[in-house]
């Protein structure tokens, strides 16, 4: 069983660094393609300010020179979902669960264990980077599939941009999650609800050592409960009354 989570734009580097590990060939090819961009080219590539582009340029070049600081990915990323995940004061069982079951999908690093060392970087599958003439999705598809081909249960907390990197065969095994609020009988969904709830759901998986879809359906977390009437076998819906 694997749980897939996305990367985040927000990062926190106010952390103890950890030792880097060598990049996979697929990752090195992506880095080599990124490293060809000048700071001014990155400004339009990322659609960011000149100041931000200069910072990203330094991050890329540090990775290229193998001088970049690395941090556990789960703690480096600091978006709303990540801030709602239990990341500290884990029991030994919770730590083991994280290491064995939770994986981050990255456009630079591939599908990697959640505590893997990562350096600060900015890249997602909506960005039009060509790697040896291929799109990022095409470049990564085989490696992404290889990571999950033996898994029977895959919980996906990914957005569609990440899910579509995988083949249809792998996507058919994914259990997707939807989180909604019930406001006086009106069901609402928006990104803030979803991001917070993904983090809370993952925390519930970790704390309850969930291994099956049946166990996930029984979870009650942050006010969310499973709604069978709204769910599909491969698509679980959790609703919070507010």
UniProtKB/Swiss-Prot annotation:
It comes from the Bacteria. One of its GO terms (biological process) is response to hydroperoxide. GO terms for cellular component: cytosol. InterPro entries: YaaA. Belongs to the UPF0246 family. PANTHER family: PEROXIDE STRESS RESISTANCE PROTEIN YAAA, PEROXIDE STRESS RESPONSE PROTEIN YAAA. This is UPF0246 protein SPP_1571. It comes from Streptococcus pneumoniae (strain P1031).
């Amino acid at each position: 069983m694997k749980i897939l989570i996305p990367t985040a734009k927000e990062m926190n580097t106010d952390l103890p660094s950890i030792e880097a590990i060598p990049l996979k060939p697929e990752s090195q090819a992506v880095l080599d393609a990124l490293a060809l961009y000048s700071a001014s080219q990155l400004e339009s590539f990322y659609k960011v300010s000149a100041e931000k582009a200069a910072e990203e340029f330094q991050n890329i070049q540090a990775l290229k020179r193998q001088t970049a600081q690395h941090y556990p990915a789960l703690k480096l990323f600091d978006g709303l979902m990540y801030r709602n995940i239990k990341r500290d004061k884990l029991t030994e069982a919770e730590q083991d669960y994280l290491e064995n079951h939770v994986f981050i999908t990255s456009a630079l690093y591939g599908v990697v264990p959640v505590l893997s060392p990562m350096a600060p970087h900015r890249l997602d599958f909506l960005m039009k980077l060509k790697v040896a003439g291929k799109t990022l999705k095409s470049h990564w598809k085989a490696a992404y599939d290889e990571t999950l081909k033996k898994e029977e249960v895959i919980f996906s907390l990914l957005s569609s941009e990440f899910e579509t990197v995988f083949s249809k065969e792998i996507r058919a095994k994914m259990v997707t999650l939807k989180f909604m609020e019930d406001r006086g009988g009106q069901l609402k969904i928006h990104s803030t609800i979803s991001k917070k709830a993904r983090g809370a759901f993952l925390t519930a998986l970790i704390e309850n050592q969930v291994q099956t879809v049946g166990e996930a359906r029984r979870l009650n977390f942050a006010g969310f409960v499973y709604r069978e009437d709204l769910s599909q076998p491969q698509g679980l819906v959790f609703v919070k009354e507010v």
